[in-house]
């Protein structure tokens, strides 16, 4: 009987940056929480010499091999050598590309790093990050009209981390705090071209988060973390969102990624509606 290991080697070989592989590898590996993957990431593998170094590593420490490689010769060499070594080898994107080709009836245009066009995607993300950082926590509210998404909510409803996550996906995101007794920025109330979303959470979760964060504000700690007071803040936030017709996302049981996914869905609908208005 083989002795069970609590780890395995995971090789990710790409002719581009490897981001696609890393995401796929982590997603699948997370389904096996009791076994720790030892990740070996090899980006920009585009010739036999580079590949041979990878194969030498696989030979020394066998494991699962995932790859995204366009060049057929390099691809076949990797697959062939993995078979010789006796390790599983999978082309992550091939099944998806084949489905697209079959459905669209058009051969795929094989292009190395096509999914990472620096002239569009990379600089769009950088621009979005710059904008989001400048518009964190109600800053620079005069040009909110340049935002794709504006997140509003009381303190500690994950506005900032969600904004940064969205910015990393190229979405210009501003966030504005909702504070009872303090007027909302005029620009926010007048904004029609940005999607405005309210974030809420349970009073219990917000209280817990507030207790474990440095306040950084001149407020009473007891009042700031008191659940009754937080419930009143949440009621105020919900009324504001309802008054202006802003959709609400409850982040109580959502990760940042799950909250962002909900934002993307709302943004898609919002843009479709705007497009229909134009047409």
From Swiss-Prot:
The question of whether Cell division is a record keyword is answered with no
Segments passing through the bilayer = none
Signal peptide coordinates: none
Task: List, alphabetically, the PANTHER family matched.
Answer: PYRUVATE, PHOSPHATE DIKINASE REGULATORY PROTEIN 1, CHLOROPLASTIC
Q: What function does the entry list?
A: Bifunctional serine/threonine kinase and phosphorylase involved in the regulation of the pyruvate, phosphate dikinase (PPDK) by catalyzing its phosphorylation/dephosphorylation.
**Protein's UniProt name:** Putative pyruvate, phosphate dikinase regulatory protein
Q: Name one GO molecular function term.
A: ADP binding
Which keywords are on file for this protein? Kinase, Nucleotide-binding, Serine/threonine-protein kinase, Transferase
Enzyme group, top EC level? transferase
Identify the residues that bind ADP: 153-160
Q: Which reaction does it catalyse?
A: N(tele)-phospho-L-histidyl/L-threonyl-[pyruvate, phosphate dikinase] + ADP = N(tele)-phospho-L-histidyl/O-phospho-L-threonyl-[pyruvate, phosphate dikinase] + AMP + H(+); N(tele)-phospho-L-histidyl/O-phospho-L-threonyl-[pyruvate, phosphate dikinase] + phosphate + H(+) = N(tele)-phospho-L-histidyl/L-threonyl-[pyruvate, phosphate dikinase] + diphosphate
Family from the record: Belongs to the pyruvate, phosphate/water dikinase regulatory protein family. PDRP subfamily.
């Amino acid at each position: 009987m083989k002795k069970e290991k609590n780890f395995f080697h995971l090789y990710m070989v790409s002719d581009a940056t490897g981001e696609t592989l890393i995401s796929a590898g982590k997603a699948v590996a997370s389904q096996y929480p009791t076994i720790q993957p030892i990740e070996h990431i090899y980006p920009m593998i585009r010739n036999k010499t580079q590949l041979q170094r990878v194969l030498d590593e696989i030979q020394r420490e066998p494991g699962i091999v995932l790859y995204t490689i366009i060049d057929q010769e390099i691809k076949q060499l990797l697959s062939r050598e993995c078979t010789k070594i006796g390790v599983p080898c999978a082309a992550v994107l091939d099944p998806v590309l084949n489905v697209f080709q079959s459905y669209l009836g058009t051969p795929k245009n094989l292009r190395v790093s096509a999914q990472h066009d620096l002239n569009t995607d990379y600089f769009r993300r950088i621009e979005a990050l710059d904008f989001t950082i400048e518009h964190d926590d109600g800053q620079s509210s005069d040009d909110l009209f340049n935002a794709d998404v504006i997140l509003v909510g009381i303190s500690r409803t994950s506005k900032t981390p969600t904004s940064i996550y969205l910015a990393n996906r190229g979405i210009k995101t501003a966030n504005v705090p909702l504070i009872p007794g303090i007027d909302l920025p005029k620009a926010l109330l007048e904004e029609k071209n940005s999607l405005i979303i309210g974030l809420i959470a349970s009073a219990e979760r917000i209280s817990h988060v507030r207790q474990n964060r440095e306040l950084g504000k001149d407020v009473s700690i007891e009042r700031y973390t008191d659940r009754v007071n937080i419930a009143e803040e949440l009621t105020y936030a919900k009324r504001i969102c309802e008054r202006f017709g802003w959709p609400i996302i409850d982040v109580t049981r959502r990760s940042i990624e799950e909250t962002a996914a909900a934002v993307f869905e709302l943004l898609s609908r919002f843009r479709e509606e705007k497009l229909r208005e134009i047409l």
